[in-house]
Every structure is written in C-alpha cells, then in structure tokens.
Amino acid sequence: MTAIRIRTLALALATTLALAACGYTLRQAQPLPQVLNAVVIEAVNLDSLLVMDLERELKGAGATLKPLNTTGVSVLKIQEETAERNVISLDDRAKVGEYELHYRVVYAVDGADGQPLLRDTPINLSRVYSFDEQQALGAAQEEDLIRSELRREAVRMIL
C-alpha cells in the first residue's frame, strides 16, 4: 500500500472511532404513535406537497391511510399551511442581499372516537439565505431546496 492510502485509511478509522466514542448514531426511523396506525388526512389542499410527504412517511412507517369520511380511525387535520419570503437585508445599491423563508403549519389530531388528542398545534420554521442577482437561477433553486427542507422538517415534527 502507498503512504497516501494508509493515511486515508487511518484517518477514516480514526473518524469512525471518534464518532462511535461520542455516542453518535445515524438517525433511525421513529416508531409511529399507536394513534396514527390507521389515519385519515384532512387538509384544505389534499394535493399539497406537505400532504404528499405526510402520506409517504406514514406509509413508510407502516400506517394505513384511509379515505376521507372513514369512521373509527384517527384524523390528522392540516388546518393551515403558509410559506412567506421576507427581505432581511439590502446591499449598498438597495438590492436584496438576504431573504428569510417562513413556513407555518397548524395541525390537530382527533382520536378514533372523535375526541381531540392534539388541538391546533403550530409549527413555525424559518431559514435565511443569501441572494445574488447575478445568479438568479441558482438562487431560485436554492429557495426551492430550502422550502422542501422546511416541509420535510415539518413532517418529522408532526409525526
């Protein structure tokens, strides 16, 4: 083996040992609460990306999704979903330098008996990102990526 290969292998081994020693583990799928094993999703917009992400995560965790108006199952209600973009800073030419994306979801959960288990629970997330007008296409892609990350984080918080 060459010296570079040995160093690379030694560095990888040292990093692995350091991570193991500090207790780091990869995030594992969290078990679903029992109440969400069979669930109906109600939302103002059932075609929203949030609802699609929720459905995918619920199915992946082993939940059974039931059609609307099914009785005897829990109901996950997405009552509000909003996304806003605000200007945070301007440069010396009064051009936008940074934006902040806000993402808000309000949800509730009713049990199979119709009793509220979780009432109007808000999730408020935000991220700041730099904007360069010289790279407007890249900035639009970055904004889309941040929006999808915020949505995925909201899904994790709901479940």
Where are these regions (language model features)?
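C-terminal/domain-edge helix-coil "capping" segments
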Residues: 137-159
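Sec/Tat-exported extracytoplasmic proteins
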Residues: 43, 58-62, 109-113, 133, ...
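Surface-exposed short loop/turn segments
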Residues: 77-122, 126-144
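N-terminal segment of the mature soluble domain
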Residues: 37-82
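C-terminal motif of bacterial Sec signal peptides marking the signal peptidase cleavage site
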Residues: 18-21
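Bacterial signal peptide processing site
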Residues: 23-26
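Acidic/histidine-rich, surface-exposed loop or edge segments in extracytoplasmic proteins
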Residues: 34-42, 135-139
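Bacterial N-terminal signal peptides that target proteins for export
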Residues: 1-11
